[in-house]
Amino acid sequence: ALGPVSALGATHPLTLNVPDIWRDTPNQYGPLFLGVQKAVYALTGDHVIAGTALHRVVAVLGILMLGWSVPRLAERCGVSDVAALWLGVANPLVLFHLVSGIHSEALMMGLLGVGLVFVFRALDDMGPETPRPPARVLALFVAGAVLVTCSALVKIPTVVALGFVGMA
């Protein structure tokens, strides 16, 4: 993984906008988020404002996925879905930090949340109370596992969740 100076050069306009402390730091993002960054750059070029705006759109998509998944996960765990939504998604700290700071964690957590919802639905569909066709159960489980894997491809810490999916 390369840092801004080694990847772009010390005089590149984007490198000049990186604080000195981070200029030689290697990139810690996974291949999926690097692909997102590459697509943003392909669309916006050296236009910092447009690139920042597009990265924020990606962060908002992650927050929207999180907003869809958190109440469902909370309900499954016997926690108030409204409280979970306010504390986990809609509070100013989450919105300010993840969207304003254009952090990859918004996309990472959104993919993780939706993936876990799909995996849990597959497990619920296997139960005797609500038997579903095996193809549906398998499709939900595989889709969930793929989304959790994509989350880990944004940033590696969520690979731990894939272990729990495998144990499910």
Model regions: which residues?
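Transmembrane-helix motifs of polytopic, lipid-linked glycan transferases
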Residues: A53-C77, M109-G110, V114
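Membrane-interface transmembrane helices that cradle and orient dolichyl/undecaprenyl
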Residues: G78, E105, L112-L140
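Membrane-water interface at transmembrane helix exits
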Residues: Q37, Y41, G45, P71-E75, ...
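Transmembrane-helix signature of polytopic, membrane-embedded enzymes
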Residues: V70-P92, L123-T130
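Membrane-interface starts of transmembrane alpha-helices
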Residues: D46-V58, S80, A84, R136, ...
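Intramembrane catalytic core of multi-pass membrane enzymes that act on lipidic substrates
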Residues: A1-V57
